[in-house]
Amino acid sequence: MTVLKMTDLDLQGKRVLIREDLNVPIKDGVVSSDARILASLPTIRLALEKGAAVMVCSHLGRPTEGEFSAENSLKPVAEYLSKALGRDVPLVADYLDGVDVKAGDIVLFENVRFNKGEKKNADELAQKYAALCDVFVMDAFGTAHRAEGSTHGVAKYAKVAAAGPLLAAELEALGKALGAPAQPMAAIVAGSKVSTKLDVLNSLSAICDQLIVGGGIANTFLAAAGHKVGKSLYEPDLLDTARAIAAKVSVPLPTDVVVAKEFAESATATVKLIADVADDDMILDIGPQTAAHFAELLKSSGTILWNGPVGVFEFDQFGEGTKTLAKAIAESKAFSIAGGGDTLAAIDKYGVADQISYISTGGGAFLEFVEGKVLPAVEMLEQRARA
């Protein structure tokens, strides 16, 4: 994968537009989870150190396109960046016809989704973005799977289009995990539905030695193997699909589980052998016996890809399975890569971030890359590099 990299460019005195993924949760006008902003800071700082006039853009939430919405404003992000960088980061609302920014200074553009044509990747809008800069830097891996004005269109029309350090690191880490993984390889794929992760499961079944499933996905595999899952979430129409995947790769199934009679923070957790699951039970986590077995599989792996917690870890009584696996990944000598929104929240909760080789900031983009799909924004950077 050959792309031009921002780190190789002379940015002194250049107007540089950086597309970051600053789509962070905001609560009461304040950033409530800063992981994506923290991930973007090294790129922004590097551009400033290189003497560029820096313009940063991002989306936030899903506003009605072309309309301002206070709840989707990047104002709290501008305030956060000002504190983090120790300098004023003005939020610029009207920028499409030009913006005044000096070398060594930085501005943040208001939410790109307030611009008509952003999501449809309109040429006219993309050309306006491109006219603002000498160099466009795509650094938002989390939106690289979307062909939009500020991710794909601008890369097509900018004088120079390059990958930022964060995007380049994501591509390198994923390439290492999927292209030539150290053996044996284990993957954890968890979520509510097999249907939403079917392509991921099929793709990983071709390269994994152990495919550990969790959540509603595991319930479907358990039901496919003839086990009772009570009133747990599962997909009865995908039992044959689960069996077909299990025929291609080792899918170790839980031997014990944590169940409850209701899905609630106050629910009482009970550990049961899988054979003892009652008709009115909901499976909300893997049991300690299963967690210990899965942990051993992970500790002996050469590569680990982790997407999704294996239980309802938001409720502590159903979080022990995810906690045990998180600690096992942290203690493993394997090259480990983790991605997907809930996965990042679990990593935060159990304090293992520093012991995971690479944490992907992309949710949908991470999954599409794992599926083997082409990411439009990356493909455009490759085309520009070839040209």
UniProtKB/Swiss-Prot annotation:
PROSITE patterns in UniProt = PGLYCERATE_KINASE (PS00111)
Gene name tied to this protein? pgk
Metabolic or biological pathway: Carbohydrate degradation; glycolysis; pyruvate from D-glyceraldehyde 3-phosphate: step 2/5
Q: What class of enzyme is it?
A: transferase
Q: Which family does it belong to?
A: Belongs to the phosphoglycerate kinase family.
Which keywords accompany this UniProt record?
Answer: ATP-binding, Cytoplasm, Glycolysis, Kinase, Nucleotide-binding, Transferase
Say if the entry is tagged with keyword Nucleotide-binding.
yes
- The residues listed in the UniProt record as binding substrate, with positions renumbered to this chain, are 21-23, 36, 59-62, 113, 146
Example of a GO biological process term: glycolytic process
This protein's major location comes to cytoplasm
Quaternary state and interactors? Monomer.
Where can this protein be found? Cytoplasm
For this protein, what is any one GO molecular function term? Answer: ADP binding
EC number in record: 2.7.2.3
Instruction: Tell me which residues bind ATP.
Output: 197, 314, 340-343
For this record, the Gene Ontology CC terms, alphabetical, are: cytosol
Q: Which reaction does it catalyse?
A: (2R)-3-phosphoglycerate + ATP = (2R)-3-phospho-glyceroyl phosphate + ADP
Annotated PANTHER family: PHOSPHOGLYCERATE KINASE, PHOSPHOGLYCERATE KINASE 1, CHLOROPLASTIC-RELATED
**What is the protein's name according to its record?**
Phosphoglycerate kinase
Classification via Pfam families: PGK
**Keyword ATP-binding on entry:** yes
